[in-house]
């Protein structure tokens, strides 16, 4: 994570207090990164340098800095950061990010795995963040998106493969101005939408609420695939983003059937109405709508069902 992403996860204050906390975190984080042998061989590093560090080092440095304070100086900022750090380390939901076992330099291996280099006939990576705690989901998506962008920038002199980054529920991460919160994920996805082509990165945004997307990002989409939309506001938003010659298709959007869509833009020679092929059942994602009538008419096995669901719920798996 870079410094901005650390702030989103570790800082709980706001206003002037947040700036004070951020300054303290920047100083301590840089000191923790500097303890790594990689930092010592590279020379000068910054707080954003992708150098691994030990959480225990960060904790100890915070403790040391707090011990240097005069009595008149408030230790509240240090206590806030340490308390949040201890809370994250103790919560099993955050073990994938803050486990004490994650102390090695695994960056190259991680990138090879995520980017499928080599692909070995399987060039697609699917990253499911549904099990990630909701308060850091955006940060996790920001880290992954920034890895894609930074890898492309620093790999310009290499023959790296173009990457298509597809983001589901995109309105959560690049919301319109009314709902924008200045998060790091919105900044990096907006930057990829505007600059990614120069570095061989394309961005695919999937949303059921296009009117909630940032207009600046949607305007960068060269190809639009529109499925059935019933909301007038969403239809108007999609119409504004469509090329002039495709707007006549908009009247048919509310009447589209399942698996039908309107495609227009750079990806097709002319705007067209398309029906997707039916996938075999074992290849479909678990997103099909349940049959209410069929399930309501079935009885039996409810007690065991509840037990199984509660067990998975409690174990978070």
List PLM regions with ranges:
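P-loop NTPase motor domains
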Residues: 1-191
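Solvent-exposed, flexible loop/coil residues
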Residues: 1-5, 102, 136, 140, ...
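Preference for short coil/turn "hinge" residues that link or interrupt alpha-helices
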Residues: 51, 81, 104-107, 125, ...
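Conserved P-loop NTPase motor module
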Residues: 258-317
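Conserved ATP-driven motor cores of ASCE-family P-loop NTPases powering translocation/secretion/packaging/pilus
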Residues: 12, 184-185, 190-277
